Amino acid sequence: MRHLKSGRKLNRHSSHRLALYRNQAKSLLTHGRITTTVPKAKELRGFVDHLIHLAKRGDLHARRLVLRDLQDVKLVRKLFDEIAPRYRDRQGGYTRVLKLAERRRGDGAPLALVELVE
């Protein structure tokens, strides 16, 4: 039975799912907002919130944990020096998911906009 199993599989195996989260997190932190499907957006929200929470700590271990996921030194530097200080007084909810009215042209999948809260 599947009771109390959290998280979505998104029809991918675990390494593919992790690569998807990492790529979308990089895009979101680089550009500030991205458009994706609703289930991917809801999963990305928790992944990015965790990275920002680690960046708020600011210590070396947190930097290494974030670098493990983002694998981009310049982006980690941007996260720690520019993005995390904006959320110094915020206790969570660093990202926002807005459902869009239009659907994807190819398959009609519902789309959402994921953005960093100001």
UniProtKB/Swiss-Prot annotation:
Belongs to the bacterial ribosomal protein bL17 family. The keyword Phosphoprotein does not apply. InterPro entries: Ribosomal_bL17, Ribosomal_bL17_sf. One of its GO terms (cellular component) is cytosolic large ribosomal subunit. This is Large ribosomal subunit protein bL17. Part of the 50S ribosomal subunit. Contacts protein L32. It holds the Pfam family Ribosomal_L17. Keywords: Ribonucleoprotein, Ribosomal protein. GO terms for molecular function: structural constituent of ribosome. HAMAP family: Ribosomal_bL17 (MF_01368). The keyword Ribonucleoprotein applies. One of its GO terms (biological process) is translation. It comes from the Bacteria.
